[in-house]
């Protein structure tokens, strides 16, 4: 619960009052600790068994909070939802263009992938263009996500390394920028490294906050990660969805947003929620999940985004809450609702495959605040 604490915000977030970087300084205020609300309920025998608490913030490209559940200003670590914003310096600096990174490679910069062959090959390609190989990556190594996702042991004799890490695309991008800028590579994950200082400064601008107001922690891949109000995270993605029309990061946002929706298989992988949502979104939705119950979904046609935090990090509850928000906002048609129905996780099955309970969203979005 430590991450869900007070934070300084710019703007009060009320509908029509922007949270953006142009908000006057006198509107800075402190937000009280987050108020969580029940988002998803599990029932058994018709009786409530579990409640998953959390919060939702729906924000437009100007930073106005359009709708919410719980406290939209509650602070959460962003985890892998931050990757698209962490990739901005690579584009803003011209490094991506100088190295000739393809659209597919830009998509992998934003990925939490499965370590499938296409992911590994694309990470290798980014590194090769920077004149490096996987041995410089500082993300560490884990069993490829495809196997953990399916709850299966990897084949005997399978060799995996840093390229298979779900964050290898982000780290390959970090290395590429270091090479282009002439920065040292061996300590690129350190918070004081010029790369990470550039990332922090750019992320702060993208979400309309001051650097000193953004708490920092170290992510599972050893890179710095940042905590912020859900409304700020959603604001950054609403700007990403705005693309070329964004006045500060337009060209970079356009390239990243187009890459993510054109290559959702590279952003995630077989069987993953982000892949399912972006395919169902038909090029309009940008979706990114982060560890421990965080997700952001943005709509290009609306220049809006919503961020969700499930406080206990439960993934099935997160999926159910996301589908509910899509429905309540009217973003889905009947075909899309049918395509994503399995992600509601409505029936809870026992070891014999018999339905013994149900999981369902139990919240209604309220107006902006």
Language model segments and positions:
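Active-site SXXK
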Residues: 78-95
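Beta-lactamase-like hydrolase cores
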Residues: 23-73
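Short glycine-rich loop/turn motifs
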Residues: 51-56, 172, 200, 292-295
């Amino acid at each position: 619960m430590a991450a869900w604490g007070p934070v300084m915000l710019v703007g009060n977030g009320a509908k029509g009052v922007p949270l953006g970087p142009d908000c006057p300084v006198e509107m800075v205020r402190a937000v009280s600790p987050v108020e969580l609300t029940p988002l998803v309920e599990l029932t058994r025998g018709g009786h409530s068994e579990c409640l998953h608490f959390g919060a939702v913030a729906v924000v437009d490209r100007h930073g106005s909070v359009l709708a919410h559940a719980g406290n939209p200003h509650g602070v959460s670590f962003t985890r892998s939802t931050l990757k698209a914003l962490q990739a901005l310096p690579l584009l803003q600096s011209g490094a991506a263009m100088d190295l000739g990174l393809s659209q597919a490679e830009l998509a992998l910069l934003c990925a939490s992938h499965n370590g499938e062959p296409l992911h590994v090959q694309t990470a290798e390609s980014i590194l090769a263009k920077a004149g490096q190989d996987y041995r410089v990556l500082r993300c560490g190594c884990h069993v490829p996500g495809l196997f953990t996702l399916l709850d299966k042991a990897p084949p005997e004799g399978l060799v995996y390394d840093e390229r298979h890490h779900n964050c290898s695309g982000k780290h390959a991008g970090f290395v590429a920028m270091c090479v282009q800028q002439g920065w040292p590579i061996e300590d690129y994950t350190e918070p004081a490294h010029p790369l990470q200082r550039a990332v922090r400064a750019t992320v702060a601008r993208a979400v309309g906050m001051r650097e000193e107001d953004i708490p920092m922690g170290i992510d599972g891949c050893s890179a710095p990660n940042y905590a912020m109000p859900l409304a700020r995270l959603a604001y950054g993605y609403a700007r990403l969805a705005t693309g070329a029309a964004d006045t500060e990061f337009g060209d970079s946002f356009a390239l990243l947003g187009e890459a993510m929706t054109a290559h959702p298989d590279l952003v995630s992988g077989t069987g993953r929620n982000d892949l399912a949502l972006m395919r169902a979104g038909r090029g309009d939705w940008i979706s990114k999940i982060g560890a421990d119950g965080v997700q952001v979904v943005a709509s290009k046609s609306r220049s809006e985004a919503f961020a969700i935090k499930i406080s206990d990090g439960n993934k099935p509850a997160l999926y159910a809450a996301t589908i509910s928000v899509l429905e309540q906002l009217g973003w889905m048609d009947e075909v899309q609702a049918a395509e994503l129905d399995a992600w509601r996780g409505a029936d809870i099955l026992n070891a014999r495959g018999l339905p013994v309970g149900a999981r369902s969203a139990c919240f209604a979005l309220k107006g902006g605040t």
